[in-house]
Amino acid sequence: GGEPLLQMDFVTELFTLAKKEGIHTALDTAAGPYREDPEFKSQFDKLMAVTDLVLLDIKHIDEQSHKKLTGITNAYALSAARYLDSIGKPVWIRHVLVPGYTDDDKALEALADFLTSLNNIERIEVLPFHNLAAFKWKELGIKYTLAETLPPTQKRIDNARKILSRAGLVS
């Protein structure tokens, strides 16, 4: 489990074996570890050679809002998205709709603008936030800052899908 880009050698080996067996490979990543340096890029290119599809999480298009939500910049995910576009790798974008964090129209419009600039996006998934994992945080003794956050209404989900639909196929 966890972020596959932190385990690139293992995932590359696993995907290589899967491809030999004719199994389709999909990498599900938030791309937080993605870097432009030559060493990382070399490893990443090896992984992409055996990856059929990338499921890329873009938590927030605004850098400060992304940092507030995740603790890190969104520059890595956006850079990865641009690079994946440059190599023609098929990508499905996944955007978790968190009320009060990732559901404002201005940010959704900006995300749609960014995604429209890419030619490799095959699908955009709007994933409504839920609190099903709250118990895990409690068991770990870690404060869950989204514990009081309610799932988005169907109206907000439909709104996000409508805005993002101009950038591609939305589900």
Features from the language model and the residues they span:
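Glycine/small-residue-rich loop that forms an oxyanion/phosphate-binding "nest" at active or ligand-binding sites
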Residues: 1
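Conserved AdoMet/S-adenosylmethionine-binding subsite of the radical SAM
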Residues: 4-127, 132
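Glycine-centered secondary-structure boundary/capping sites
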Residues: 71, 138-141, 168
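C-terminal accessory region of radical SAM enzymes
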Residues: 90-91, 155-171
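A structural motif corresponding to the C-terminal lobe/cap of the Radical SAM core domain
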Residues: 113-116, 122, 138-163
